[in-house]
Amino acid sequence: MKKQLLSALIGASLLAPMAASAADYVIDREGAHASITFKVSHLGYSYVVGRFNDFSGDFSYDAAKPTAAKVNVTVNTLSVDSNHAERDKHIRSADFLNTSKFAQATFTSTTVEDKGNGDLVINGNLTLNGVTKPLAINAHAVGEGQDPWGGYRAGFTGTTTFAMKDFGIKMDLGPASSHVELDLVVEGVRK
Protein backbone atom coordinates (compact mmCIF):
# COMPACT_ATOMS: atom_id res chain seq x y z
CA MET A 1 0.00 0.00 0.00
CA LYS A 2 2.80 2.42 0.90
CA LYS A 3 4.54 1.59 -2.36
CA GLN A 4 1.39 2.36 -4.40
CA LEU A 5 0.81 5.61 -2.52
CA LEU A 6 4.42 6.66 -3.03
CA SER A 7 4.19 5.85 -6.76
CA ALA A 8 0.98 7.86 -7.06
CA LEU A 9 2.51 10.86 -5.27
CA ILE A 10 5.65 10.78 -7.42
CA GLY A 11 3.53 10.49 -10.58
CA ALA A 12 1.31 13.38 -9.51
CA SER A 13 4.30 15.56 -8.67
CA LEU A 14 5.81 14.91 -12.10
CA LEU A 15 2.56 15.74 -13.90
CA ALA A 16 1.69 18.84 -11.85
CA PRO A 17 4.23 21.15 -13.51
CA MET A 18 3.04 20.06 -16.96
CA ALA A 19 -0.60 20.77 -16.14
CA ALA A 20 0.24 24.25 -14.87
CA SER A 21 2.41 25.35 -17.78
CA ALA A 22 1.39 27.01 -21.00
CA ALA A 23 1.22 24.95 -24.16
CA ASP A 24 2.93 26.10 -27.36
CA TYR A 25 0.96 26.26 -30.60
CA VAL A 26 1.73 26.95 -34.25
CA ILE A 27 -0.91 28.90 -36.18
CA ASP A 28 -2.70 26.60 -38.64
CA ARG A 29 -2.60 28.79 -41.71
CA GLU A 30 -2.04 25.95 -44.17
CA GLY A 31 -5.28 24.26 -43.13
CA ALA A 32 -7.08 27.57 -43.76
CA HIS A 33 -8.00 27.71 -40.08
CA ALA A 34 -6.60 31.20 -39.59
CA SER A 35 -7.08 34.51 -41.35
CA ILE A 36 -6.01 38.13 -41.20
CA THR A 37 -8.55 40.38 -42.90
CA PHE A 38 -8.74 44.15 -43.07
CA LYS A 39 -11.39 46.76 -43.75
CA VAL A 40 -10.92 50.41 -44.68
CA SER A 41 -13.73 52.87 -45.26
CA HIS A 42 -14.01 53.87 -48.91
CA LEU A 43 -14.74 57.60 -48.87
CA GLY A 44 -17.22 57.09 -46.04
CA TYR A 45 -19.69 55.36 -48.39
CA SER A 46 -18.63 51.73 -48.23
CA TYR A 47 -15.62 49.55 -47.35
CA VAL A 48 -12.65 48.05 -49.11
CA VAL A 49 -12.10 44.60 -47.65
CA GLY A 50 -9.04 42.43 -48.08
CA ARG A 51 -6.76 39.88 -46.52
CA PHE A 52 -3.19 38.75 -46.22
CA ASN A 53 -2.74 35.33 -47.79
CA ASP A 54 0.72 34.55 -46.39
CA PHE A 55 1.52 34.75 -42.68
CA SER A 56 2.90 32.56 -39.95
CA GLY A 57 3.12 32.59 -36.21
CA ASP A 58 2.97 30.85 -32.91
CA PHE A 59 1.59 31.41 -29.45
CA SER A 60 1.67 29.95 -25.97
CA TYR A 61 -1.51 29.73 -23.94
CA ASP A 62 -2.75 28.28 -20.67
CA ALA A 63 -6.46 28.79 -19.95
CA ALA A 64 -5.69 28.69 -16.21
CA LYS A 65 -3.23 31.58 -16.58
CA PRO A 66 -4.12 33.57 -19.72
CA THR A 67 -2.04 36.58 -18.65
CA ALA A 68 1.10 34.50 -19.31
CA ALA A 69 0.17 34.04 -22.99
CA LYS A 70 2.59 35.09 -25.72
CA VAL A 71 1.96 35.73 -29.42
CA ASN A 72 4.29 36.19 -32.40
CA VAL A 73 3.05 36.72 -35.96
CA THR A 74 4.86 37.56 -39.19
CA VAL A 75 2.89 38.74 -42.24
CA ASN A 76 4.19 38.77 -45.80
CA THR A 77 2.84 42.18 -46.88
CA LEU A 78 3.34 41.25 -50.54
CA SER A 79 0.45 38.81 -50.06
CA VAL A 80 -2.14 41.58 -49.62
CA ASP A 81 -5.29 40.68 -51.57
CA SER A 82 -8.29 43.00 -51.93
CA ASN A 83 -9.66 41.05 -54.91
CA HIS A 84 -8.66 43.86 -57.30
CA ALA A 85 -5.24 43.59 -58.99
CA GLU A 86 -4.73 47.31 -59.68
CA ARG A 87 -5.73 48.32 -56.16
CA ASP A 88 -3.44 45.62 -54.71
CA LYS A 89 -0.57 47.01 -56.77
CA HIS A 90 -1.29 50.45 -55.30
CA ILE A 91 -1.54 49.06 -51.73
CA ARG A 92 1.90 47.44 -52.20
CA SER A 93 3.39 50.75 -53.41
CA ALA A 94 5.22 53.36 -51.33
CA ASP A 95 1.86 55.16 -50.89
CA PHE A 96 0.77 52.43 -48.46
CA LEU A 97 2.69 49.28 -47.46
CA ASN A 98 5.90 49.98 -49.39
CA THR A 99 6.46 46.25 -49.83
CA SER A 100 9.59 46.70 -51.95
CA LYS A 101 11.26 48.08 -48.83
CA PHE A 102 9.23 46.43 -46.04
CA ALA A 103 8.07 42.99 -47.15
CA GLN A 104 7.09 41.91 -43.64
CA ALA A 105 4.92 43.15 -40.83
CA THR A 106 5.25 41.65 -37.36
CA PHE A 107 3.30 41.59 -34.12
CA THR A 108 4.90 40.54 -30.84
CA SER A 109 2.88 40.54 -27.65
CA THR A 110 4.20 42.23 -24.52
CA THR A 111 1.37 41.68 -22.00
CA VAL A 112 -2.03 40.04 -21.90
CA GLU A 113 -4.96 41.25 -19.81
CA ASP A 114 -7.64 38.78 -18.71
CA LYS A 115 -11.08 40.44 -18.90
CA GLY A 116 -12.97 37.28 -17.87
CA ASN A 117 -15.19 34.84 -19.79
CA GLY A 118 -12.45 34.20 -22.36
CA ASP A 119 -12.08 37.89 -23.23
CA LEU A 120 -8.49 39.13 -23.44
CA VAL A 121 -6.61 42.26 -24.41
CA ILE A 122 -3.35 41.33 -26.10
CA ASN A 123 -0.94 44.26 -25.92
CA GLY A 124 2.11 44.23 -28.13
CA ASN A 125 4.19 45.92 -30.77
CA LEU A 126 3.15 46.06 -34.41
CA THR A 127 5.88 46.76 -36.95
CA LEU A 128 4.41 47.90 -40.26
CA ASN A 129 5.98 49.95 -43.03
CA GLY A 130 9.20 50.13 -41.01
CA VAL A 131 7.48 51.72 -38.00
CA THR A 132 6.95 49.99 -34.64
CA LYS A 133 4.08 51.13 -32.41
CA PRO A 134 2.13 49.65 -29.51
CA LEU A 135 -1.12 47.96 -30.49
CA ALA A 136 -3.89 46.38 -28.40
CA ILE A 137 -5.95 43.50 -29.79
CA ASN A 138 -9.34 42.71 -28.26
CA ALA A 139 -9.39 38.92 -28.33
CA HIS A 140 -11.68 36.09 -27.32
CA ALA A 141 -10.74 32.49 -26.57
CA VAL A 142 -13.19 30.49 -28.70
CA GLY A 143 -12.27 27.06 -27.37
CA GLU A 144 -9.70 24.31 -27.21
CA GLY A 145 -9.56 20.53 -27.28
CA GLN A 146 -8.64 17.36 -29.11
CA ASP A 147 -9.07 17.27 -32.88
CA PRO A 148 -10.11 14.17 -34.89
CA TRP A 149 -6.51 13.59 -36.04
CA GLY A 150 -4.98 13.09 -32.60
CA GLY A 151 -3.79 16.66 -32.13
CA TYR A 152 -4.85 19.41 -29.77
CA ARG A 153 -6.06 22.84 -30.93
CA ALA A 154 -6.92 26.22 -29.44
CA GLY A 155 -8.81 28.98 -31.25
CA PHE A 156 -9.18 32.72 -30.82
CA THR A 157 -10.72 35.71 -32.56
CA GLY A 158 -9.46 39.27 -32.37
CA THR A 159 -10.10 42.79 -33.58
CA THR A 160 -8.11 45.98 -33.56
CA THR A 161 -8.05 49.35 -35.29
CA PHE A 162 -5.12 51.62 -36.04
CA ALA A 163 -4.48 54.92 -37.80
CA MET A 164 -2.52 54.56 -41.05
CA LYS A 165 -0.55 57.75 -40.34
CA ASP A 166 0.82 56.16 -37.13
CA PHE A 167 2.72 53.73 -39.35
CA GLY A 168 4.05 56.29 -41.81
CA ILE A 169 1.28 55.79 -44.38
CA LYS A 170 0.69 59.33 -45.53
CA MET A 171 -1.70 58.75 -48.42
CA ASP A 172 -4.71 60.96 -47.67
CA LEU A 173 -7.94 59.13 -48.45
CA GLY A 174 -10.04 61.58 -46.44
CA PRO A 175 -11.05 61.56 -42.77
CA ALA A 176 -13.47 58.64 -43.19
CA SER A 177 -10.65 56.45 -44.53
CA SER A 178 -7.84 57.15 -42.09
CA HIS A 179 -8.06 53.93 -40.04
CA VAL A 180 -7.67 50.23 -40.74
CA GLU A 181 -9.78 47.63 -38.96
CA LEU A 182 -8.21 44.18 -38.60
CA ASP A 183 -10.21 41.01 -37.95
CA LEU A 184 -8.22 38.00 -36.84
CA VAL A 185 -9.16 34.33 -36.65
CA VAL A 186 -6.47 32.12 -35.17
CA GLU A 187 -6.47 28.38 -34.68
CA GLY A 188 -3.31 26.87 -33.33
CA VAL A 189 -2.11 23.28 -33.32
CA ARG A 190 -0.21 22.28 -30.20
CA LYS A 191 3.46 21.64 -30.96
Curated annotation (Swiss-Prot):
Taxonomically, the superkingdom here is: Bacteria
Cell compartment(s), UniProt:
Periplasm
- Note the Gene3D superfamilies from the entry: Lipid/polyisoprenoid-binding, YceI-like (2.40.128.110)
Name the keywords, alphabetized. Answer: Periplasm, Signal
Family, according to the entry, reads as follows: Belongs to the UPF0312 family. Type 1 subfamily.
**From what organism does this protein derive?**
Shewanella baltica (strain OS185)
Q: Does the keyword Signal apply?
A: yes
Question: Is Signal there in the keyword field?
Answer: yes
The molecule here is called UPF0312 protein Shew185_3055
Q: Where is the signal peptide?
A: 1-22
**InterPro entries assigned to the protein according to its UniProt record, in alphabetical order:** Lipid/polyisoprenoid-bd_YceI, TTHA0802/YceI-like_sf, UPF0312/YceI
Q: Which PANTHER family match?
A: PROTEIN YCEI (PTHR34406:SF1)
Q: Name one GO cellular component term.
A: periplasmic space
Q: Which Pfam families match?
A: YceI (PF04264)
